[in-house]
Amino acid sequence: MKEEIMNQTNVKIGQLRDRMKELGIDAYLVPTADFHESEYVGEFFKCRHFLTGFNGTAGTAVITMDKAGLWTDGRYFVQAEEQLSGSEIKLYRMGEPEFPTLDEFLEEELPVDGCLGFDGRVVNSELGYGLQNLLQEKNVTINCSKDLVGEIWTSRPAMSCEPIWSLDVKYAGKSTVEKLSDLRDAMKKNKAQIHLMTALDEIAWLFNLRGNDIVNNPVFLSYALITQDEAYLYVQKEAIKEDTKMGKEVCAALAEAKVQVKEYAEFLQDVAALKNAVC
């Protein structure tokens, strides 16, 4: 059974390399992340687990044309050794001097004029620009437009879309109207025209809403865009069950706060359309 799993892992790595070769990508990075930098991620976002077979909550995989590595911390050394055993993936123990760091590995393995790929939706700007600066001496380009693991993950679970529900103000402390007013005051002080939100816990707090899109975390997949006059909440609209008591309460609460609901998938294109705004 274990041998079969390891063979499947090596097959997946081979499939990924085929796509990398087609696109001219020399190394592909797969973090443990969703679109919101959540500490824990839903099943849809477990690309690193799918690719490597390692199911710890922290770790980053890098695949090149002839090497495959997983970086994780001391909490997971024993587990990772067991789950990677028999595959071609090497465990790089973070914090131990005999193992290169992720940065050191990329500096060494990427060729001059090479290309590093990753899904830019799950890599934050700090890491992305850091990698760009790290590799600029080798004139390495970044391709952040491809979810290559998603392309080979034919049985990928659907993105979670559990019902959203409203938290009573007696538990929330302040109404959404009050919280938006406080936020807009802070925006004025900082001369910000637009406030973008991507962290799920912060969005749930601001709008006094809760969900169950990540196990044991009362959050829902969402973004928010706030101006002095408007507030937009981006969610999967199917998560607001308007024909149920719970859904009607959500709609009423958002209407009271003059919050407009938009489709989750529209957020990135709306942000791309922003021009000359101070965020």
Feature names for model-found ranges:
Residues 2-110, 123, 127-273:
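N-terminal accessory/capping or targeting/presequence segment of soluble
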Residues 114-121, 279:
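Acidic beta-strand-to-loop metal/phosphate-binding motif
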